[in-house]
């Protein structure tokens, strides 16, 4: 009876699909002695730390310890490693791809783990927050820009000049290319957060709708099995999106690094 009451209260006070994305303090400490210093652990910080902890556990489980035959964890991680390595090397080039692959691999695992954690019911989707994804995208684009200037100097601005551009259209096209280059900061982070955010909101709306149907009577309970099956299928689709968005993020990152290195 208490469980049912708590469930009813949950859907009553969490009717908004945006409630699940609120950043809240899990633990907070106020220290007036140090000048009203507020120390807190938020839900996004907690789940990001949990993601790092899970990553450590997965790496320990996938370690072969010099065994000839690896376990299922090591085989899956090696397959993922080989797939990403092929993508990065083909996207950049065999030489520079080896240099930047560790960073891109760590970035992929970080995004993927946090995407999957967000799929767990009553957890927190860290990658649905624009503050996190924009921090990643701005840092990556800024780093690629610094890399380009470090290698090419002022010649890096030739990236903004399209090949075979007529002289009369040069100012306009350079302006368009410059705006397009700046838009990378927004588009890279926006794509990831928007896909995760929209998927979780839709699942929340469908779950609330299904719950209201199934608690309206015995007949409606069986009718609610239809949208419940759709929710289960859509959850499987969201798992696929979690992998796809992580892959898209690192593919675009590899492309930005390639542009900075090769100026095209």
From Swiss-Prot:
Keywords on record: ATP synthesis, CF(0), Hydrogen ion transport, Ion transport, Membrane, Mitochondrion, Mitochondrion inner membrane, Transmembrane, Transmembrane helix, Transport
Gene3D superfamilies to which the protein is assigned, alphabetical: ATP synthase, F0 complex, subunit A (1.20.120.220)
Topological category with respect to the lipid bilayer: Multi-pass membrane protein
GO terms of molecular function: proton-transporting ATP synthase activity, rotational mechanism
Stretches that traverse the bilayer: 41-61, 99-119, 129-149, 156-176, 194-214, 217-237, 238-258
GO cellular component annotations of the record: mitochondrial inner membrane; proton-transporting ATP synthase complex
Pfam families named among the record's database cross-references: ATP-synt_A
Annotated signal sequence range: none
Listed NCBIfam families: ATP_synt_6_or_A, PRK05815.2-4
Function: Mitochondrial membrane ATP synthase (F(1)F(0) ATP synthase or Complex V) produces ATP from ADP in the presence of a proton gradient across the membrane which is generated by electron transport complexes of the respiratory chain. F-type ATPases consist of two structural domains, F(1) - containing the extramembraneous catalytic core and F(0) - containing the membrane proton channel, linked together by a central stalk and a peripheral stalk. During catalysis, ATP synthesis in the catalytic domain of F(1) is coupled via a rotary mechanism of the central stalk subunits to proton translocation.
Assembly with partners or alone: F-type ATPases have 2 components, CF(1) - the catalytic core - and CF(0) - the membrane proton channel. CF(1) has five subunits: alpha(3), beta(3), gamma(1), delta(1), epsilon(1). CF(0) has three main subunits: a, b and c.
HAMAP family: ATP_synth_a_bact
Protein's UniProt name: ATP synthase subunit a
Phylogenetic classification of the source organism: Eukaryota, Fungi, Dikarya, Ascomycota, Pezizomycotina
Gene (name only): ATP6
